[in-house]
Every structure is written in C-alpha cells, then in structure tokens.
Amino acid sequence: MTKKFLSVCVYCGSSSGINPVYADAAKELGRALVKHHLSLVYGGGHVGLMGIVADAVLDAGGEVTGVIPKALMDTEVGHERLTRLLVVKDMHERKALMAEHADGFIAMPGGIGTLEELFETLTWAQLGFHEKPIGLLNVAGFYDPLIEFLRHQTSQGFLRAEHKDLLLMETEPDPLIAELKTFTMPKGVSWLSRQRAQTLGP
C-alpha cells in the first residue's frame, strides 16, 4: 500500500459466543494490533467480542476509537475507557464513520450485524468506492461455511473470482495483519472502473 497503514476497523459480535476460543482470539487480535503499531476502530461497545478486543488494545497501551449510535449509548452499552468515543445519530452514520477512520478492516466471528458490515465493506470495494484491504479472521473454522458459500457463488456465476479474492482470509492475527499491510488493489477489479473502461474504450 502507498498510504500509511495506521488503523484497523474490527467487525465482531456483541456477544462472546459459546466457545471460549472466540474471546481468546479477540484478546490475541487486540494485542497483535498494538504490536504492529495499529490503532483500533470499532463499534464502541463494552459487551461481547467488541468489548474484549477493545480492552485488549487498551490494556496493551494502544489507542481505540469507538463509534456508537446514540440509541445504543443511551442503553449504557458504550465503552467508557476508550481513547475516543464518537456518538452518532444512526447505524448508517456509524458504518460510514468507522470506514472513514480506518485504513483496513478485519471481521471476526459475529452475527447478522457483523456480516452486514463485512459485506457492505466488500460491496464498496467491489464498486470501487474504496481500495482498503478487508480481512476475515477465521477463528476455529467459524467462517468455513461462509467461505464455501462464496466459492459456490463464484462457481454459479454470481460472484467474480477477483471480487471473492478481495477478502483476505487467515486463521491467526499476525499473518492477516501482514497481508493487510501489503495489500494493493488490483487494477480493473472495481465494477465502476470496468464500466468506465468499456465506455471510454482503449
């Protein structure tokens, strides 16, 4: 990447899951971010994997920016120890601001909200709205069914292989962070760039 890589937005669950391995992985990711001199951007909550990864970064001396809608802040799920907590009006503004403050993205295990954030970020990359790296931390095979489904979409002609490959996948934080740091968006991958090329011609 030509731009300095200084911060990572982490998408993950507001619950911890039933397997302790997920919480352990969140702690490991938080410590790895600090080790690689990266700040954390996330959804601003103190609960679930969200809170665990934020606490791990803070406990290791790192910086954390949280972005949380006022409605969630009012229910007292906002984290009180963050370096910076931005309170926004709704979920749309939350996602936009998280993306604006991050140089890359990592999705950990989570629920519908985590998947929605991940796929919106991938869609933005596919369309050419950003060229930031997107990683999937596949803890204990959690995302194996999703990875297989993406392959199925590709085999059935609904997802281009180069768009599937925009999602960097690893099982450990360190190699995933290394991939994010060295990622460069391939030329001609974005849908908009292809449309412009077809319109303008050679």
Segments (PLM) and residue ranges:
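Gly/Pro- and small hydrophobic-enriched strand-loop and loop-to-helix capping segments
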Residues: 63-65, 127-140
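Active-site/ligand-binding-proximal alpha/beta "capping" segment
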Residues: 93-128, 135, 187-192
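Flexible, glycine/proline-enriched loop segments at strand-loop-helix junctions
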Residues: 108-109, 133-137, 164-167
